């Protein structure tokens, strides 16, 4: 994949070294106690290599990459103010993804996924 602008560009190759991961219940990811939800999957096992182009010159880079895809037919709940998301890739190949939706009443809605190196998933719903 590549893109370029006046002060920044990149040319990267991605290679999946593990399976797609479907969060929640086979990809159905609940977002509120009122029933908002989305379909959500990730490819957390990309190896990435390429070049960043900056005004100072090109920089060769390589490492791990994570791609998410998520879609929904409805907006978030009216009492949800924002969304915090993170992912961690551990040295043993395991991954952790988590998010919280901040709510006006302070009772934030959260969910997370533990991903084994083989791609098997354990989902943790709102606690």
Language-model-derived ranges and their functions:
Residues 1-127:
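Structured soluble/peripheral alpha/beta segments that form catalytic or ligand/cofactor-binding pockets
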């Amino acid at each position: 994949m590549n893109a370029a602008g006046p002060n920044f560009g990149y040319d990267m190759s991605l290679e999946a070294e593990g399976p797609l991961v479907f969060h929640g219940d086979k990809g159905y990811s609940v977002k509120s106690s009122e029933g908002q939800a989305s379909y959500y999957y990730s490819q957390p096992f990309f190896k990435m290599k390429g070049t960043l182009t900056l005004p100072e010159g090109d920089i060769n880079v390589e490492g791990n990459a994570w791609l998410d895809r998520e879609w929904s037919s409805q907006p978030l709940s009216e009492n949800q103010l924002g969304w915090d998301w993170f992912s961690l890739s551990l040295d043993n190949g395991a991954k952790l993804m988590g998010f919280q939706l901040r709510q006006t009443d302070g009772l934030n809605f959260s969910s997370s996924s533990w991903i084994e190196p083989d791609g098997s998933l354990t989902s943790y719903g709102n606690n």
